[in-house]
């Protein structure tokens, strides 16, 4: 009996302890109502290094007969000075034709001073509504009196003034989120395809009848909620947040045309969407606008081959019209006005390119795409909002060109890197042919490095290097140089090695797209760790393979290298008189289990020189996160082999 009693007491005690230690369950609160504990909080308990965190983000969405409304209330905790950037808020929306509108904005800062809660409201006159372009607007405001420890909150109403509109919802942000909740009242007049892109389980996921009046069921009430969501962090070789952030999406697939009608499917095909766009005067109408530039067209027509004409027109447009840094799949000003102003968005610039190619007798076609940051196209979701740019497609003999003249570093003979490994919507307006086409580059992007150096007895490596960059490596090098300037770019080539000094740097073939960018470098490196007896050096120079990008134990996103890549690193190092080779790395090969990546190292001695050859080849550009363990293990071994030292001993 005493044993049974003891067991009973132990069980009760265990339940009591669990009840005492169980983490509190947080939800949303009314505007202005706040727990003192949130004001006194100094860190995020599930992400200690966070600068700010979302305490809660709640949306209540209700569908009506002709419009949808969303009431949103968001509260953020500022944890330190770096988190104060969250106090500047921008809400963008699609305002054309009155499709969307933001109203009833309310915002305030909450502080605690000697246990007294203080509220500082944002002056309504300092809440600005501005036009971004003729299609989009934004609401902007900044919170006053913000300091570490402050809580800021805002609420607003978003109205979608079109039948069946429904906003998507992001559970995850670039700062941690303690609680995120979407409540939706959806009338039975509408049917949506609900697409969850989450890997963390919901804390709440319910469906209940939506009842109005005494017993009138008009639809369903849904709740989706998640708690303690870690901040979204960019991972090496990942596409944009749009592909990887945890969210839920809604696509209207059916609705009733009358109060007592039957539900009809309305999901449009890609062909129907494309056809409607081509027939739209603001889009398709611009394809037939004729831009006058007799000099450009005459010069293009004087060239012998179509290939030369394509190259000339592409570079002329690229170098004449400045991109305003906006990737859009619509036109704001129209091609004639953009050509006059010499500045426009991505689609406007490429429509100008399309126009001139047509005038020069080159058959070409518009093609919608989504850029890397905008997110990959989900082919089963027939929604034009997945696209954010238009490019020009040209077929010349056996070669396909995808031309984007908005980026000044793009070339006519390489597919735009920003569009690789996703599908575009190809359009042939004349034949009413509209189809999805997947874009990938089968040709490897190559980088070839030659190092010729002499090892000095005093522990210094001195010599020259030549780097030949092909395709996307060429484009990336030109972009980095143009963005950083020569001094910072040469620092980049040093890969944070303070013992490496670049004495001179020269470039060749910067203006010729068909030739590799050649970089000639004279350098000197102090071989630290060397002493009176031994010299140690690592031949992994100017390779861009100094730091392993895949050290994390887990991976949340697909690895997308963009292109398949090939690297060849060759070195010849002269051994100083009075020294002998004490230790050389062995010649070895490494291969991924599926043979998608190979690494080969050959090290040998020849006539008093050390010859080093590294070869890295990729057979594919995409690796799913399920393949990450294999990638991580391969890279760990490869970097160990790349960074293995050569040892010389004094005779």
What role is predicted for each listed range?
Residues 1-25, 651:
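Bacterial Sec-dependent N-terminal signal peptides
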Residues 20-275, 292, 351-354, 364-517, ...:
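Beta-strand-rich, non-transmembrane domain signature
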Residues 135, 297-395, 412:
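Active-site neighborhood of thiol-dependent amide/isopeptide-bond enzymes
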Residues 237-323, 331-332:
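Acidic low-complexity segments
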Residues 283-291, 308, 313, 346, ...:
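Conserved, compact domain cores that house catalytic/ligand-binding motifs in diverse enzymes
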Residues 297-301, 449-450, 556-561:
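Extended, non-catalytic structural segments that build the interaction scaffolds
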Residues 318, 322, 358, 457, ...:
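Hydrophobic alpha-helix feature that most strongly marks membrane-spanning transmembrane helices
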Residues 492-651:
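A carboxyl-terminal module marker
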């Amino acid at each position: 009996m005493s044993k049974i009693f003891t067991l009973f007491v132990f069980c009760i005690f265990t339940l009591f302890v669990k009840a005492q230690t169980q983490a509190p369950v947080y939800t949303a609160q009314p505007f202005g109502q706040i727990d003192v504990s949130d004001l006194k909080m100094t860190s995020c308990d599930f992400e200690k290094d966070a600068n700010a965190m979302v305490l809660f983000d709640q949306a209540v969405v209700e569908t009506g007969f002709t419009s949808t409304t969303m009431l949103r209330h968001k509260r953020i905790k500022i944890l330190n000075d770096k988190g104060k950037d969250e106090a500047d808020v921008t809400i963008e929306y699609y305002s054309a034709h009155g499709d969307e509108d933001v109203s009833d904005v309310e915002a305030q800062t909450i502080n605690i001073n000697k246990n007294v809660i203080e509220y500082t409201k944002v002056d309504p006159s300092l809440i600005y509504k501005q036009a971004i372009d003729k299609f989009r607007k934004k609401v902007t405001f900044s919170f006053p009196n913000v300091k570490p420890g402050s809580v800021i909150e805002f609420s607003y109403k978003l109205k979608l003034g079109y039948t069946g509109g429904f906003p998507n919802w992001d559970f995850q942000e670039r700062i941690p989120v303690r609680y995120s909740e979407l409540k939706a009242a959806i009338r039975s007049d509408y049917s949506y395809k609900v697409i969850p892109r989450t890997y963390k389980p919901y804390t709440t996921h319910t469906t209940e009848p939506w009842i109005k009046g005494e017993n009138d069921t008009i639809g369903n009430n849904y709740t989706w909620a998640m708690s303690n969501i870690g901040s979204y962090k960019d991972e090496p070789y990942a596409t944009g947040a749009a592909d990887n952030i945890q969210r839920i999406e809604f696509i209207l697939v059916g609705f009733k045309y009358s109060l007592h009608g039957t539900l009809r499917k309305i999901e449009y095909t890609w062909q129907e969407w494309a056809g409607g766009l081509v027939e739209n005067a603001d889009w398709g109408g611009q394809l037939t606008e004729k831009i006058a530039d007799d000099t450009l067209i005459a010069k293009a027509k004087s060239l012998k081959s179509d290939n030369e004409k394509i190259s000339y027109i592409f570079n002329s447009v690229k170098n004449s019209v400045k991109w305003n840094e906006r990737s859009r799949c619509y036109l704001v000003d129209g091609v004639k006005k953009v050509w006059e102003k010499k500045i426009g968005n991505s689609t406007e610039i490429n429509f100008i390119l399309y126009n001139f190619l047509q005038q020069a007798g080159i058959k070409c076609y518009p093609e919608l795409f989504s850029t890397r940051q905008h997110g990959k196209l989900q082919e089963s979701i027939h929604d034009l909002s997945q696209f954010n740019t238009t490019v020009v497609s040209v077929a010349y003999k056996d070669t396909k060109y995808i031309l984007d003249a908005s980026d000044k570093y793009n070339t006519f003979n390489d597919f735009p890197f920003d569009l690789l490994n996703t599908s575009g919507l190809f359009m042939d307006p004349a034949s009413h042919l509209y189809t999805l086409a997947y874009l990938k580059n089968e040709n490897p992007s190559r980088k070839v490095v030659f190092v010729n150096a002499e090892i000095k007895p005093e522990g210094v490596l001195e010599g020259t290097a030549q780097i030949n960059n092909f395709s996307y490596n060429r484009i990336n090098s030109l972009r980095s140089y143009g963005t950083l300037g020569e001094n910072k770019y040469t620092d980049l080539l040093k890969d944070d090695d303070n013992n490496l000094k670049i004495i001179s740097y020269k470039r060749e073939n910067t203006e010729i797209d068909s030739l590799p960018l050649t970089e000639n470098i004279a350098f000197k490196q102090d071989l630290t760790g060397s002493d009176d007896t031994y010299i140690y050096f690592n031949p992994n120079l100017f390779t861009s393979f100094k730091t392993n990008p895949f050290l994390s134990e887990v991976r949340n996103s697909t690895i997308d290298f963009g292109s398949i890549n090939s690297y060849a690193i060759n070195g010849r190092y002269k051994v100083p008189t009075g020294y002998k080779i004490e230790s050389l790395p062995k010649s070895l090969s490494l291969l991924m289990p599926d043979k998608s990546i190979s690494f080969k190292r050959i090290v040998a001695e020849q006539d008093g020189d050390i010859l080093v050859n590294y070869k890295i080849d990729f057979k594919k550009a995409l690796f799913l996160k399920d393949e990450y363990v294999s990638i991580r293990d391969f890279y760990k071994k490869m970097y160990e082999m790349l960074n293995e030292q050569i040892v010389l001993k004094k005779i």
